[in-house]
């Protein structure tokens, strides 16, 4: 079993690296698109804040991913090990592919889809029944995929429209934009910290399940997860940052602030209602909303179509990959 923990640690680090590479765009892309920060500054700031958030505030969400979808307490521990490893590998592969093609997918939905695949594979082999999978949790997640980007888009549209009417149309735009440059950087830093605390669980949750999770997440698991995210941002984070920050619509400081403020507010409201939402989906929706405030022509619809397609296929692809890997492990290992 010690060997499996070592393997899980390596695979978990790989998934955390993927999270950093893809999800760095959640917190810092709009700051890059509006030129509030350079790419080098973004990599340094995001790496530090994501790592800090993951290490010191990542325990609670790790608990949810470890036990919130598949009832691991009802399964033989060897099956839990196979399923969690298969989920980590599948989510990691899919995130790598998406990052290569500059697509901002939800790493949360990747690991959720992978864990669903684990549960369905266990059902197919009569280790679980279909009603033992926690479908109510999955229903809330599915609902969040629709609500969060739409709400983020609407709120960003309203916020930027108010800024334009109350400030930009009345005062010198250069002085207003200068003030919002600093406000946007502060918002981005907060989002990076919050994202690290939430999404590190996508890598550490399955590791906790493999270790026979009983309530206490070891510090080294969170440390490794946070380190993996930081390394991912530093080495490959620029790919998706460019897509969200520059290719959807043109971003100024006020536009970038509006998108980040709308995203943070949407995620906070969802948390108060216990709704698990994707920061990725919410931010992309918010960026689109800001673009629409300038008219439909200012939004790159081809990029938006590619992003939406990647969202739709994430869960079934991650689930199918997990089912295949899990089945091979059960048969051959």
Swiss-Prot record:
Predominant location of this chain?
membrane
Alphabetically sorted, this entry's keywords are: Cell membrane, Membrane, Phosphate transport, Transmembrane, Transmembrane helix, Transport
Highest taxon above the source species = Archaea
Single Gene Ontology BP annotation: phosphate ion transmembrane transport
Q: Where are the transmembrane segments?
A: 1-21, 37-57, 79-99, 103-123, 143-163, 217-237, 284-304, 312-332
Q: Does the keyword Transmembrane helix apply?
A: yes
Q: Which InterPro entries match?
A: Phos_transporter
Q: Name one GO molecular function term.
A: phosphate transmembrane transporter activity
| A Pfam family annotated for this UniProt entry | PHO4
- What membrane topology does this protein have? Multi-pass membrane protein
- Supply one GO CC term from the record: plasma membrane
The compartments listed are:
Cell membrane
Family label:
Belongs to the inorganic phosphate transporter (PiT) (TC 2.A.20) family.
Q: What does this protein do?
A: Potential transporter for phosphate.
* Stated name of the protein: Putative phosphate permease AF_1798
């Amino acid at each position: 079993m010690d060997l499996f923990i070592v393997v899980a640690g390596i695979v978990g680090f790989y998934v955390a690296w993927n999270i950093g590479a893809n999800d760095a765009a959640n917190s810092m892309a709009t700051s890059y698109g509006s030129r509030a920060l350079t790419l080098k500054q973004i990599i340094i700031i995001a790496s530090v804040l994501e790592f800090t958030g993951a290490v010191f505030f990542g325990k609670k969400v790790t608990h949810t991913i470890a036990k919130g979808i598949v009832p691991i307490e009802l399964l033989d521990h060897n099956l839990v090990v196979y399923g969690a490893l298969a989920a980590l590998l599948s989510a990691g592969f899919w995130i790598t592919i998406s990052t290569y093609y500059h697509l901002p997918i939800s790493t949360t939905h990747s690991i959720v889809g992978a864990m669903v695949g684990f549960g369905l594979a266990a059902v197919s082999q009569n280790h679980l029944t279909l009603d033992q999978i926690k479908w109510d949790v999955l229903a809330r997640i599915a609902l969040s995929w629709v609500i969060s980007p739409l709400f983020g888009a609407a709120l960003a549209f309203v916020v930027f429209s108010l800024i334009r009417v109350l400030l930009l149309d009345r005062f010198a735009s250069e002085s207003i934009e200068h003030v919002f440059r600093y406000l946007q950087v502060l918002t981005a830093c907060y989002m990076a910290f919050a994202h690290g605390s939430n999404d590190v669980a996508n890598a550490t949750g399955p590791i906790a399940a493999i270790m026979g999770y009983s309530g206490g997440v070891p510090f080294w698991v969170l440390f490794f997860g946070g380190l993996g995210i930081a390394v991912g941002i530093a080495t490959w984070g620029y790919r998706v940052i460019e897509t969200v920050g520059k290719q959807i619509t043109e971003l100024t400081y006020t536009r970038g602030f509006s998108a980040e403020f709308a995203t943070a507010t949407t995620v906070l409201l969802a948390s108060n209602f216990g709704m698990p939402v994707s920061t990725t989906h919410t931010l992309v929706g918010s960026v689109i909303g800001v673009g629409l405030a300038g008219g439909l022509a200012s939004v790159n619809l081809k990029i938006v179509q590619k992003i939406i397609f990647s969202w739709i296929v994430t869960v079934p692809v991650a689930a199918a990959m997990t089912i295949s890997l899990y089945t091979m492990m059960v048969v051959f290992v």
